[in-house]
């Protein structure tokens, strides 16, 4: 009887310590679709096209490895109070979850940008770009794929265009 009680107690402890109440990026993206002031777009993969017909096979292969692209932004103007809250929420999600590894940070034209990834360094499954600027707003872009090569992703980004007809991507000019 003592063994059963010990095993049951260990199970209960394991159950409670394994529960994680941290919000995930996926939960944040879904919740943002319902929040006032947010701009959200899910870009269908068939909208991502090579800039020209003579792009490398690596670019074509990288495009094929992408499954989903999500964009979420909150323009600063008119959302001053929510800006700080949302910036801190995203910072917390990305910095406290061991799943997200920092790839690089940059500061360009007053926009602070952090790039994160999941997977291994040579086979990335997810790329997250998180940026913010006090006069622009806060936003996050997520590319989901399968075994993406970081150097090929950069090459691809320089060689693609997004067919924005029907997506109304101009609304992102408000934020960035």
Listing of model-derived features with the role each one plays in the protein:
Residues 26-90:
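Early exported N-terminus immediately downstream of N-terminal targeting peptides
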Residues 15-18:
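C-terminal motif of bacterial Sec signal peptides marking the signal peptidase cleavage site
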Residues 34-60, 99-116, 166, 173:
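Generic detector of solvent-exposed, compositionally biased contiguous segments
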Residues 120-149:
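A short, solvent-exposed beta-edge/loop patch
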Residues 2-9:
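Sec-dependent signal peptide recognition
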Residues 146-176:
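C-terminal partner/receptor-binding element of secreted or periplasmic proteins
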Residues 74-115, 119-122:
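Mid-length scaffold segments of soluble, non-membrane domains
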Residues 20-23:
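Bacterial signal peptide processing site
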């Amino acid at each position: 009887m003592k063994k059963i009680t010990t095993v049951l107690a260990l199970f209960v402890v394991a159950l409670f310590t394994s529960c994680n109440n941290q919000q995930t990026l996926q939960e944040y993206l879904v919740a943002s679709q319902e929040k006032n002031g947010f701009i959200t777009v899910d870009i269908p993969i068939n909208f991502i096209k090579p800039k020209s017909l003579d792009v490398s096979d690596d670019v074509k292969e990288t495009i094929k490895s992408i499954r989903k692209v999500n964009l979420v932004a909150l323009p600063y103007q008119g959302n001053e109070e929510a800006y700080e809250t949302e910036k801190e929420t995203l910072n917390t999600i990305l910095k406290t979850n061991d799943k997200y590894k920092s790839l690089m940070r940059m500061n360009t034209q007053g926009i602070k940008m952090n790039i994160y990834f999941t997977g291994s360094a040579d086979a990335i499954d997810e790329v997250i770009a998180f940026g913010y600027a006090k006069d622009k707003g806060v936003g996050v872009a997520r590319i989901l794929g399968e075994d993406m090569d970081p150097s090929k992703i950069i090459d691809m980004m320089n060689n693609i265009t997004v067919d924005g007809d029907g997506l109304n991507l101009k609304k992102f000019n408000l934020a960035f």
